[in-house]
Amino acid sequence: MLNPDSPQYFKDLSEQLVRYTLKVLKRLDKSEGVDGKYATFINMNTVLQNPNQDGRKLVTRFGQLKGETDAEQKENADIASWFINEYYAERSKVYENSSGIRAQVSKVIANRYLRGILNPDFDKGQRNQIDFDEHLEKGGVICICTAQGMMRDLGKFLGYFIILQLQSAVFRRPGNEDNRRAHFLYIDEFQTYSTPGFSDMLTQGRSYRVASHLATQARAQIAMGGGRDGKNFVELVSTNARNLI
């Protein structure tokens, strides 16, 4: 995760880089009618690091895809051009100024536990076994341990990743408040995974029938992951809490 107090330019650049990378990988998957063959952290690292020009090869293949619409076709061409002419260019400032996100992704695939969990081997028939969209529709119980004692800061990253995945699934739920199945999210040691980005879940989650139960040692600790916005985030958590125990 980038420091919340990083200059806005670096945060915007990193967000753009990640967004473009994900579109490259997910649309390569879609072009072959599969899910998870290209869209893995290993391939994400390949696009970001470009070892032996392998990232450029993936981007070039992506640029040759036929979009489902004219708008998508143009976006594909624009993204491929951005990578080839700006990101992969010799002595690229864009590449230089996005070192933070590359370092974070490298840490993930360097850890043997996360490498196995987050990168199912498509060719061996391995697939992602957690589908939050299906879970929200049909119900059930999912328990996830981030192994803080074993992985330390990478356990925190795993927590961020899982929460963001769930949050995305929540906000694309079909239906309305009357026909969505109710769900309950429990996060222990919330201060470990708290970021201002979770605020949408607190302010809008109830509309999607997802209630959050957050456990922390002290509310002041929640601000630790929020940078300058930390105090405001603590206030937002308190304001949106129905019960404080």
Which positions does each model-derived feature cover?
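P-loop NTPase motor domains
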Residues: 1-210
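Conserved ATP-driven motor cores of ASCE-family P-loop NTPases powering translocation/secretion/packaging/pilus
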Residues: 202-245
